[in-house]
Amino acid sequence: MKSHFWIFAVFVFCVATFDVIAQVTEGIHFYMPFNEEKGKVVKDVGPKGFEAELHDSAKFVKGKVGTAIEFSEGPAVIIDPRPGGPSQLYVAHLTVAVWIYPFEISDEVFGKGHLYGNIFYDKSGKSDDNVEFGLGSGEGLYWYINSGEKKMRPFNPADVNTTLSLPNLGLKPENWYHVVGTFDGEKVQVYLNGKLEGEKDVPRHGPVMLWNENDIHIGGRPNINDGANLYKGLLDELVVYDRALTTDEVVEVMNSTNILTVDFADKLTTTWGVLKTQ
């Protein structure tokens, strides 16, 4: 009878764990663990098969999990290798999650809390921005989603956007941090090491995601401010979703060494070992 109880307990655990796996893998847009170890192209190991072309200065180094990319003088460019038709890179909602190891952190508070080191960046028009996620002023983080219409016009100061600037988070150079920005159409949120650090409601008339033919960059915003918006440091385990993750999912992603498996085998082995001692 006792053995039947523990078999049932294992079954319940397996069902619950598979449910978590389904939640964390649902909506993966691209996942780049950066474990190639060499070369100038990194692969999306998710279902869509995107790629990132690295800057000449980028190099593979020991990372948080396996290897990471060291950025210093220029960003990587995300591309859709499939020819023809509209790009599949564009989404309505968004989560960007990544491990960062910055070489430089500024304790200065800049005007409007703007950022100085872009982690993830896309431009929506000739002079306006669509998405910005990066290091912010005052040892903090910065998350920006633009507003507007499907056919983006040149920059208009009256455009509604949602900027979540979180200074004074205490970021220090040469430390690993797991950072996450989410946007679900109703609010934006920023997480640091699995903790929700801030959120902001989206204005009633915007913003929306404004994608076009402009490149998506990771590891810096090129050709602006004499390089001030280039990220200098390591990035590892970049995963982008086409939806906003929940807090529990953010923690699960942070604790995973492979988003596509969520360490199921290790969890099952550990749990079965505990059950056998009962």
What are these regions (language model features)?
Residues 21-51, 61-245, 265, 269-278:
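Extracellular glycan-associated modules
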Residues 202, 255-258:
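A generic structural signal for secondary-structure junctions
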Residues 7-19:
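Bacterial N-terminal signal peptides
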Residues 258-266:
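Feature responds to low-complexity, polar/acidic, surface-exposed segments characteristic
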Residues 1-7:
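Bacterial N-terminal signal peptides that target proteins for export
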